[in-house]
């Protein structure tokens, strides 16, 4: 897989430089803190017929004038500005560690800073370089997924999943690449909830093999470690291997894997290791104590690519469609599944999430009295394009006995083999 190389930071006031990039190079941006009171209403629309004919595949901004006007109004809600707090440590004179007189660490201040929810303000018109938002800091697996999905993109780090959604909605980014499930850890529930709350469309997917490494400051040996920090899922995916390495360490959870590596480098922590990628070690000046420490070599994370507008469904290649629906009454879920089964459409995923607007449903029964049931939203992926008549008829039938139905996207399937290769 093509590696990403960050360049120097760019002021968020100018957002993006209108310069072209040579093939294979990815550029990052940084920003000042801008507080913006923007919120997104829940999307309760029903879209079962795929993308309208006016939508252009791969094209963003069919209603750009309206978006720019809306963004200008939102920008007027800016209430304050404050400069980024300077970070210290990580690049100065450091006490010797196991014979090493100095540590040649990357200056944290020279790396791109993740956008926060207060940084969001409308971006000006931009050039042809595609800007892709992801959650985390440089070196995160989401950054690698963004580079795999859009090799020549300009990657924009965001500190939260919701910030990545809003970055696309406010034209700061053209796309967002966010994880939705892992082959070992399961679904990323937060992003399923955000898919329903925001009005973005799934336009593609990418599957990324995950190869964890144990990282520490140069000169630090494994027997000197007292704790290991990383994202909770990363720690869980490496639990057996960490034990086999003979490490008597405490496990502590942080927001993301690359953020753990950045934290160790910035604070010169000699008793702490991070579970992160090899790229994170390179970026933050850490050494790799052990490679491939995931318990299962077939560790794969699935990411979805999000845009403001859907793409036109096609029939010339395998497509996948994602929907979400709510139901009322008995036997509705069986009827929904039957609508696909009768048309020989394979379901690849079904996920239930609590219905936030109606968490509990009361059912009065003359025999047993009043019963309380949890209400759920169901997320379903199936192998068919919305251009397929079978899919159109299936959703038309589903809509008849569901109280809510929304098509999240119909998009090409990622057909690349997910072979666990450390060189990827």
From Swiss-Prot:
The gene is ADT1. This is Arogenate dehydratase 1. Pathway: Amino-acid biosynthesis; L-phenylalanine biosynthesis; L-phenylalanine from L-arogenate: step 1/1. Keywords: Amino-acid biosynthesis, Aromatic amino acid biosynthesis, Chloroplast, Lyase, Phenylalanine biosynthesis, Plastid, Transit peptide. InterPro entries: ACT-like_dom_sf, ACT_dom, Preph_deHydtase, Preph_deHydtase_CS. It catalyses: L-arogenate + H(+) = L-phenylalanine + CO2 + H2O. It holds the Pfam family PDT. Mostly expressed in flowers, especially in petals (corollas and tubes), and, at low levels, in roots, stems, leaves, pistils, stamens, ovaries and sepals. One of its GO terms (molecular function) is arogenate dehydratase activity. Residues 321-412 form the ACT domain. Has no detectable prehenate dehydratase activity. It comes from Petunia hybrida. GO terms for biological process: circadian rhythm; L-phenylalanine biosynthetic process. Residues 131-308 form the Prephenate dehydratase domain. Disruption phenotype: Reduced arogenate dehydratase activity leading to lower levels of phenylalanine (Phe) and downstream phenylpropanoid/benzenoid volatiles. Petals accumulate unaltered arogenate levels but decreased shikimate and tryptophan (Trp) levels associated with the down-regulation of carbon flux toward shikimic acid. It is found in: Plastid, Chloroplast stroma.
């Amino acid at each position: 897989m093509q590696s990403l190389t960050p360049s120097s930071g760019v002021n968020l006031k100018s957002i993006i430089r209108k310069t072209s990039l040579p093939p294979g190079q990815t550029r990052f941006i940084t920003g000042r803190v801008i507080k913006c009171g923007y919120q997104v209403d829940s999307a309760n629309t029903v879209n079962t017929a795929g993308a309208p004919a006016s939508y252009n595949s791969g094209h963003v901004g069919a209603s750009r004038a309206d978006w720019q006007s809306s963004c200008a109004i939102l920008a007027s809600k800016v209430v304050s500005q404050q400069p980024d707090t300077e970070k210290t440590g990580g690049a100065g004179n450091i006490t010797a560690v196991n014979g090493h007189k100095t540590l040649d660490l990357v200056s944290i201040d020279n790396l791109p800073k993740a956008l926060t929810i207060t940084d969001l303000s409308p971006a000006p018109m931009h050039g042809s370089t595609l800007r892709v938002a992801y959650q985390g800091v440089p070196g995160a697996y989401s950054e690698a997924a963004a580079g795999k999905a859009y090799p020549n993109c300009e990657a924009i780090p965001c500190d939260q999943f919701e910030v990545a959604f809003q970055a696309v909605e406010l034209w700061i980014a053209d796309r967002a690449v966010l994880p939705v499930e892992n082959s070992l850890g399961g679904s990323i529930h937060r992003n399923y909830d955000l898919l329903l709350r925001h009005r973005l469309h799934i336009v593609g997917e990418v599957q990324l093999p995950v190869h964890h490494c144990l990282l520490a400051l140069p000169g630090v040996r494994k027997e000197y470690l007292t704790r290991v920090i990383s994202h909770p899922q990363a720690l869980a995916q490496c639990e057996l291997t960490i034990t086999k390495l003979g490490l008597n360490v405490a496990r502590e959870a942080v927001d993301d894997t690359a953020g753990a590596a950045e934290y160790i480098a910035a604070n010169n922590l000699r008793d702490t290791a991070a579970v992160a990628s090899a790229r994170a070690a390179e970026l933050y000046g850490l050494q790799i104590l052990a490679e491939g420490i995931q318990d299962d070599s077939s560790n794969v994370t699935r990411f979805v690519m999000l845009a403001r507008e859907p793409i036109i469904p096609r029939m010339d290649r395998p497509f996948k469609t994602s929907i979400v629906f709510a139901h009322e009454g008995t036997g509705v879920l069986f009827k929904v599944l039957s609508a696909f089964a009768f048309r020989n459409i394979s379901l690849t995923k079904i996920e239930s999430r609590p219905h936030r607007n109606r968490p509990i449903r009361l059912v009065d029964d003359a025999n047993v009295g009043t019963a309380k049931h949890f209400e759920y939203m169901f997320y379903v992926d199936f192998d068919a394009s919305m251009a397929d008549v079978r899919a159109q008829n299936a959703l038309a039938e589903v809509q008849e006995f569901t109280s809510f139905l929304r098509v999240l996207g119909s998009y090409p399937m990622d057909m690349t083999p997910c072979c666990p290769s450390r060189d990827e």
